[in-house]
Amino acid sequence: VITEAAALADEHGFTAVTLSAVARRLEVRTPSLYSHVRDRDALLDGIASLALAELAARISAAIAGRSGRDALHAFADAYRTYARESPGRWQSLQRRTGETAVRSQAARDVVALTGALLRGYPIPETEHVHVIRLLGSTINGYLSLERNGSFDHSDPPPEQSWPRIIDALDALLSAWPT
């Protein structure tokens, strides 16, 4: 059920995901879905949990054996590629999710991988929450603007700005104020 809902989100947008739309896709009646998910919020949280697991796997593969600037670029590129290839799933991560997704192993994996990335910088662990918020807002903000076409009518193209933004993040993380 969750996999089909995620595919629906990727094909038609996250807001298109409803219990009835998923039921139609599965060629079943909507009430039969309630044996799998409690309600629409649980369905959406299931997509978020799936997205977190997929994203964690991509980040893990991308940053393995890397540190510092190289790891940061790989980390950000993994996010960007995921957002492009799985837009509905990525959108599921841009909302407040329920406790099940927040406390999932996949969420813990993403946090741990982000922590591993940050160990390549001179940032005390007590500052990590601030850095994680900066990374999330910068990367996801850029991806959201890019996805919505906000950069379509200006030069240079977003492909030129992306590495510069990640380099700017690297410079900031390398000189993080404590």
Question: Can you say where each PLM-predicted feature lies in the sequence?
Answer:
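An amphipathic alpha-helix adjacent to DNA-recognition modules
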Residues: 2-6, 10, 15-16, 27, ...
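Append "Primarily bacterial transcriptional regulators
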Residues: 17, 21-24, 33
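Short, hydrophobic secondary-structure boundary micro-motifs
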Residues: 18, 90-94, 151-155
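Key DNA-contact positions within bacterial/archaeal DNA-binding proteins
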Residues: 29-31
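N-terminal hydrophobic signal/anchor transmembrane helix of membrane proteins
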Residues: 54-57, 63-65, 71-82, 161-178
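Amphipathic alpha-helical packing segments from all-alpha helical-bundle domains
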Residues: 94, 98-125, 129-133, 158-171
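Amphipathic C-terminal alpha-helical segment
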Residues: 137-154, 171-178
